[in-house]
């Protein structure tokens, strides 16, 4: 018990209480903003192996509960993740999963193929699963996603008749908007069977069969198809590629992008390279890795991509 308290004393951003069955401890100075209630002690060895997994799984089992302001509790611990203990060698299978085609398809399927109805419960009508773009303070999530796609399409400088590839096309809203507004010919690729089926349904529903196609395909198979596109876009998919495959991903883009073409890459980024959080990798995004901007720019140079524009949408993602 005391060892656990000593471990938790490293997290000092907010004052909080730690409660056990027969005892209570005050950590930090000032009035506590929340209480961590341990109904069952967590072995110190588990906290040292992975603080994230130990606390997260204890909460899932009901061995740990948060009383008071849950947002502040999450902000408190997640904002100090640099103080978490992570034994990367002991968590190798979680932290550094295989980036083979077979394994990445399995990881994508485990996240996206749990049913479109589930995603419809909390995504907006566009089924966009990435950062919105808020032009006005009172923009709804739907309007922010429409804004985002419109903004992306403008950055791509599309013209009627152009060909556009969307790598990781999701449920297809971006390509549908591009076809309707610019009369481009678009191709979307995804590894998710659920997204593939829904996108196909939407294409038929919108009468866009002459403009759009969607394929179940790994980006690594693109060069084999000998496709060539005027424009390539990828929104929120790079996080699934894996650090070992960033260069390969960009190589594949370079091979299918026509000379003088434009490539727009939208991704969640970190300031520095980091293997990621064990709990998130195990339960939310298997195989997911957040790249840094600097490493992606470095890889882009190897394929002679000239960076024309960089924009940070962090505040928009926070609101999304």
Region locations from a protein language model:
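Feature captures hydrophobic
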Residues: 1-145, 151, 155
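Conserved SAM-binding loop of SAM-dependent methyltransferases across substrates and taxa
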Residues: 171-182
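Conserved class I S-adenosyl-L-methionine
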Residues: 160-168
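Conserved SAM-binding strand-loop segment of SAM-dependent methyltransferases
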Residues: 206-220
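A short glycine-rich, Lys/Arg-flanked "PGG" loop and its adjoining helix->strand segment in the class I
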Residues: 247-259
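Substrate-binding/catalytic lobe of Class I Rossmann-like enzymes that use SAM or dcSAM, i.e.
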Residues: 268-320
């Amino acid at each position: 018990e005391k060892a656990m308290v000593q471990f938790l004393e490293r997290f000092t951003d907010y004052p909080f209480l730690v409660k056990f069955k027969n005892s209570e401890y005050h950590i930090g100075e000032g009035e506590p903003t929340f209480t961590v209630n341990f109904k069952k002690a967590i072995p110190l060895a588990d906290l040292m192996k992975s603080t994230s997994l130990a606390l997260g799984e204890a909460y899932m089992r009901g061995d740990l509960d948060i009383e008071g302001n849950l947002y502040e509790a999450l902000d408190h611990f997640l904002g100090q993740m640099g103080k978490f203990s992570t034994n990367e060698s002991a968590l190798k299978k979680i932290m550094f999963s295989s980036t083979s085609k077979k394994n990445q398809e399995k990881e994508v399927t485990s996240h996206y193929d749990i049913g479109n109805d589930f995603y419809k419960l909390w995504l907006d009508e566009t089924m966009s699963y990435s950062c919105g773009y808020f032009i006005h303070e009172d923009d709804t999530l739907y309007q922010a996603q429409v804004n985002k796609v419109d903004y992306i399409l403008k950055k791509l400088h599309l013209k009627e008749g152009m060909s556009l590839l969307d790598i990781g096309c999701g449920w297809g809203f971006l390509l549908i908007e591009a076809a309707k507004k610019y009369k481009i010919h678009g191709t979307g690729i995804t590894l998710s069977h659920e997204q593939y089926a829904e996108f196909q349904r939407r294409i038929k529903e919108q009468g866009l069969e002459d403009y759009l196609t969607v394929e179940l395909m790994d980006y690594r198979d693109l060069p084999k198809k000998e496709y060539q596109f005027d424009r390539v876009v990828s929104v929120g998919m790079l996080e699934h590629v894996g650090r070992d495959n960033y260069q390969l991903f960009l190589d594949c883009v370079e091979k299918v992008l026509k000379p003088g073409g434009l490539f727009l890459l939208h991704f969640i980024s970190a300031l520095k390279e980091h293997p990621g959080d064990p709990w998130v990798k195990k339960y939310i995004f298997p195989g997911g890795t957040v790249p840094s901007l600097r490493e992606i720019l470095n890889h882009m140079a190897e394929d002679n991509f000239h960076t024309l524009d960089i924009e940070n949408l962090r505040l928009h993602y926070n609101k999304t």
